[in-house]
A protein has these predicted regions:
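Amphipathic alpha-helical coiled-coil segments and their boundaries
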Residues: 33, 40, 47, 103, ...
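Acidic, low-complexity, intrinsically disordered peripheral segments
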Residues: 19-22, 79, 397-421
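Small/polar, glycine/serine/threonine/aspartate-rich low-complexity segments that form flexible
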Residues: 22-26, 72-105, 223-234, 263, ...
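Bacterial Sec-pathway N-terminal export signals of envelope proteins
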Residues: 20-72, 80, 103-105, 118, ...
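Periplasmic alpha-helical coiled-coil/stalk elements that build and connect Gram-negative outer-membrane
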Residues: 132-244, 342-345, 349, 369-372, ...
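A glycine-/polar-enriched beta->alpha junction
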Residues: 35-45, 52-67, 98-116, 126-133, ...
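Bacterial N-terminal signal peptides
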Residues: 5-15
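Hydrophobic stripe of amphipathic alpha-helices that form coiled-coil interfaces
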Residues: 54, 61, 68, 124, ...
Length: 421
């Protein structure tokens, strides 16, 4: 038994430790990522509560324009019944059942408040649309960051592969007595730098995964499954995109709401009328007090003098309108600038991408020629290392340029109000 236990301990001691399995990262297509972000992101849900709140305010404003019905019950006990020989005028115990029905028949101020509350729902809805666009743009930019990180890893892996191949060649030459330790150390240094750069690129990818997962309200990192295609319109009509941008639509709604408030200012001092119906039942009835009675009342109210309050309130509302119009003008200027800059950026980055791709091809050719020349003794490894760095930098430039083109196209669609669909 002891021999068996000892053998088991030896087997467990020499058995290799089970390596942890890598966690599978969920990959999501671009359109699906945008849809999930708009459905599940807490920021969108929080913005949507403003619509529900505006609707609740509308219901509250409408409530004061509808009939109100109240009921009352009261019991009265006197020290003794009151009356004379002809009968009792007030019984000692008496119960009164009453009711009140009131209805505003003329309420311009209340009606105006209801209209304002209805306009506020439109403002809240458009403001929520603007928040949805902001979340969608943040998701798209993070998605592009994931793609860029993947490209950068490919560049670093290719550069590290070249550096390790050169290091292997330098070591073989040194071992064969044909190379120098200096060349081997230079090649080793370049390989170590490549390993560090690859490690940094992989960490950047991990950070992008986590950021995308947060935006999609996922409990874990999310990867990109493919590259999005941003279709840029061939022609741009300002009259069209101005009606598509959520920020302009929301600000226009704010201006209209403020203008309505100013137009309705006179209703604050307009006459108001209210009708009320008050039935009553008393038991037991007194001699001079019938058991069933009712009263119908119509009251009319007209403010005559408010000490200048209405004039001040109207002026304040006019200032709010002016501020909203100024804000709208500023947004329109900014929007036109964003469209112009986005169009210029797309054209410029397209040209830059073509240039850096050509430069990358030439850098790869230079690296191939330099490596071959070094192997036949025509150059030193300094030229090889320099060519490797140039090829790596050219690959990085291509990755950045491709990302810049995609971001410029996204910015143009956002500026035109065409993203998200």
């Amino acid at each position: 038994m002891r021999e068996f236990v000892g053998a088991l301990i030896v087997v467990l001691a020499i058995a290799p430790e089970a390596s942890p399995q890598p966690v599978a990262i969920r990959a999501i297509a671009f359109d699906e990522a945008i849809r999930l972000a708009l459905e599940r992101n807490p920021t969108v849900a929080q913005a949507a509560t403003s619509i529900a709140r505006a609707d609740a305010i509308l219901q509250r404003a409408r409530a004061v324009t509808l009939p109100n019905i109240n009921a009352q019950v009261s019991s009265t006990t006197l020290d003794a019944a009151q009356g004379f020989e002809a009968g009792i005028t007030r019984p000692r115990n008496q119960v009164t059942f009453g009711g009140t029905v009131t209805m505003p028949v003329l309420a311009p101020a209340r009606w105006a408040a209801t209209a304002r509350a209805r306009a506020d729902i439109e403002v809240a809805t458009l403001s929520t649309t603007e928040v949805r666009q902001q979340v969608a743009v943040a998701t798209a930019q993070t998605y592009l960051a994931v793609i860029r990180a993947h490209r950068q890893i490919e560049v670093e892996e290719r550069a590290l592969e070249n550096a390790r191949a050169h290091l292997d060649y330098a070591q073989r030459r040194l071992e064969g007595g044909l190379g120098s330790r200096l060349n081997m150390l230079r090649a080793s240094q370049e390989a170590m730098v490549g390993e560090a750069r690859l490690e940094n690129a992989e960490l950047a990818l991990r950070q992008s995964w986590e950021a995308l997962g947060v935006l999609l309200a996922e409990d874990g990192p999310v990867d990109a499954a493919g590259e999005p295609a941003f279709a840029v319109p061939a022609s741009i009509d300002e009259a069209s995109w101005a009606l598509s941008r959520p920020d302009l639509l929301a600000q226009n709604a704010i201006v209209r709401s403020a203008e309505r408030v100013v137009r309705d200012s006179w209703k604050d001092v307009a006459p108001s009328a209210e009708a009320s119906f008050d039935p009553q039942y008393v038991t037991p009835a007194g001699l001079f007090q019938p058991s069933r009675t009712w009263r119908f009342t119509v009251s009319l109210t007209q403010p005559l003098y408010l000490g200048g309050l209405q004039r001040a309130v109207t002026r304040e509302r006019e200032i709010v309108v002016d501020a909203a119009r100024f804000a709208l003008t500023g947004l329109e200027i900014q929007a036109r600038s964003e469209v112009r800059l986005a169009r210029a950026s797309v054209t410029s980055f397209d040209r830059s991408l073509a240039s850096v791709r050509a430069a990358e091809a030439r850098a790869a050719e230079v690296l191939s020629i330099t490596t071959t020349s070094f192997e036949v003794g025509a150059t030193t490894n300094i030229e090889v290392i320099d060519a490797q760095r140039s090829a790596r930098d050219a690959g990085t430039a291509v990755a950045l340029a491709e990302d810049a083109v995609q971001r410029a196209r996204l910015d143009l669609l956002v500026a035109l109000g065409e993203f998200p669909q």
